[in-house]
Design a protein with these regions (language model features):
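S-adenosyl-L-methionine
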Residues: 126-134
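Short, conserved glycine- and acidic-residue-centered signature motifs
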Residues: 77-80, 102, 106
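Conserved class I S-adenosyl-L-methionine
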Residues: 94-105, 124
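N-terminal auxiliary segments of SAM/dcSAM-dependent transferases
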Residues: 1-59
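Glycine-rich helix-loop-beta junction characteristic of Rossmann-like nucleotide cofactor-binding loops
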Residues: 89-94, 115-116
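Conserved SAM-binding loop and adjacent beta-strand
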Residues: 71-85
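Conserved SAM-binding loop of SAM-dependent methyltransferases across substrates and taxa
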Residues: 106-119
């Protein structure tokens, strides 16, 4: 069962396209391949196929770190995944660690650091410009 509020990736058979969406109760997903019921996705498991109103199979996957980074709105220059991985490696980022960051910008590095620190760690970010914090 996929919890509501989860970030999911819908993979269509039509040119193998990927769509990143947050699963919300009562919020069906509409596409050229038909309507995908939020309740049907909620009842499924990650990795399974759910059929649309047009009987087209859509694969439902859990969003990876890469998917999350691709979905960020970019107000500033973003740090790319290969650079984020190198920075996390050099910092020794991992579960339970606390990392202090100067400037969060578009949030790419902050997202990566949070991913590697996990639920037991934390990222403290100081941003001088208020508009980047929104």
């Amino acid at each position: 069962m996929i919890p509501y509020g989860s970030l999911v990736v819908y993979v269509t058979p039509n040119k193998d396209r990927r769509y990143i969406k947050r699963l919300e109760e009562g919020q069906d997903w509409h596409s050229n391949d038909g309507v995908l019921s939020a309740e049907a996705v909620h009842a499924a498991n990650f990795g399974s196929e759910v059929r649309t109103s047009l009987d087209i199979p859509i694969r439902v996957l859990e969003a990876t770190l890469h998917d999350r980074l691709k979905g960020l709105k970019r107000q500033t220059q973003i740090i790319y995944p290969k650079d984020i991985a190198y920075i996390c490696l050099r910092l020794g980022a991992g579960p339970g660690r606390t990392i202090i960051e100067a400037g969060c910008g578009s949030g790419g590095l902050t997202t990566g650091l949070s991913w590697f620190c996990g639920p037991t760690g934390r990222v403290v970010s100081h941003e001088a410009r208020e508009e980047f914090m929104k």
